[in-house]
Amino acid sequence: MAAAMCFTTACTDLKPEVYGDVTADNYFTTPEQFSNLIANAYAQMIGEYGYVYREGYWSMQEYTTDEVVIPTRGTDWYDNGVPIAMHQHTWVYNTRDINNGWSFAYGGTAKCNTVLRNIRQIKGTDESLYDEATWAGIAEAKTLRAFYHFLALDLYGNVTIDSAVVEEDATKIQIKQYTSKEIYEFIEAELLACIPQLTNDVRYGSMTRPVAYALLAKLYLNAERYAGEPQWEKCAAYCDSIINGGYGYVLDGNYMNVFKTTNTNNPEIIFPIVFDAKYAKGNMLHLITLHYVHQDVYGLTTPPWNGPCTLESFYNKYDDKDKRKAQWLVGAVLDANGDTIIYDTGNKAIGDNGKLPAVITAKVTKILDATKANSFEGARFVKFEPEYGIEHHANSDFPIYRYADILLMKAECLMRLNGGMANGEALALVNQVHTRAGLEPYTSLDLDELLDERGRELAWEGHRRQDLIRFGKYAEGKWEFMDKDENGAKIDPSFRDEHVNIFPIPEWVMTANPGVYTQNPGY
């Protein structure tokens, strides 16, 4: 009878409780709900095609500098000549990495626009009814969108502004090419408008007010290249907003702690990509740089790829007393018994019947060696702690902006305003970073030494190309393997001029948008 009564009651009172409908009243009322809404826009930075991708944004910022070279070892890493072309600045407008960099940046802007469109669908189009939380969410999405535009600006210069939110029909969106200065002004205006609405709390991995300060400082640091006029005072002011903002950012007492597998919420990191070896993949730096024999040394489940390394000239910028030198592996690779591992290259014509002792050397003798005799050449990068037992992806978060960079940025601004030499305040800022590395404090400092210090501190973190351009050292490319091609033929030095400071608009972008884009000069 009880069961029958329940059935009868259910049939006469058909008012089901709804759990899944999203309305303006029941959604977007907590930070957690908005985090779910915007998660996909942040997720653009993870994965194999994300920010640290070996064939995209990161490679464009690093492979093209003195920090990274990828020698072809036998047949490994030739990749149709792309790594060599990137290193030697002989890329063209359909080079793989250049195509991928564009897709990454504008894939990010599109996802941010989707977030903003969803907010309008949930909250309605009457903005007068939006509450503080809604405006904070909009500001976060727009700041992230400005970040992706900044990446595109830095790489390609004269690009498009992707801010279409209201228009649902993508075919009706008018694509237009803007000048570098116009893109710069768009990003600046977006950030200045968003900053008052952003949360002023420290939320690890999110676009908050201090992160926007860091992005704006980066924009102003490179303003002369982007817009034709330096903005050193503005850059310094926004660095101060972080330094004096009470956010709790400090230098970690141990440099290598910043990059450990447990670096989440490290007080030095201002804005990271939050990686996870299982659920948020994408940090593969240990995998691409370590030699195959390092699999057993680090207990990795798959062999590393024996690819990117640094140049001897860059490695030699580190004093032996510099604790940051520990981010590079040079020397014998030892087995569990303390003996040097012997590696069989498979090429009987080299070494001892094809076998070479596993001794990593700083010097890279050839950028292309079909014999594989260069198998152990080039210092390997272990800043991001290789974790025992992992496979392809690491758990270490990747810092895009960190406190040490902010200190060095402000010091640079002060030096630029002081004829290129450090005053007392600039010295004090740089020495915070320099002495943390176990070195004696500077008593004087010029811009060339500051550039070297930035390199030592920020190696492989995606800043080197930008820095070399700002210091006038990029186009001239005076590092190893820049004077001869892979076959030993001399490269015409007249090819290297300022046009390489920006990459070409990818061929596929121009083909898909006929009549819209004018190719960047020199391509």
Locations of the language-model features?
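Sec-dependent bacterial lipoprotein signal peptides
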Residues: 1-9
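Long, intrinsically disordered, low-complexity segments
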Residues: 10-13, 68, 77, 105-108, ...
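An aromatic- and glycine-enriched ligand-binding surface/loop that stacks and positions planar moieties
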Residues: 12-80, 159, 163, 184, ...
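Conserved, well-structured interaction surfaces
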Residues: 35-36, 43-49, 75-156, 178-182, ...
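C-terminal substrate/ligand-recognition segments
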Residues: 95, 99, 335-429
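Short coil/turn connectors between adjacent alpha-helices in alpha-solenoid helical repeat scaffolds
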Residues: 101-104, 175-182, 224-234, 421
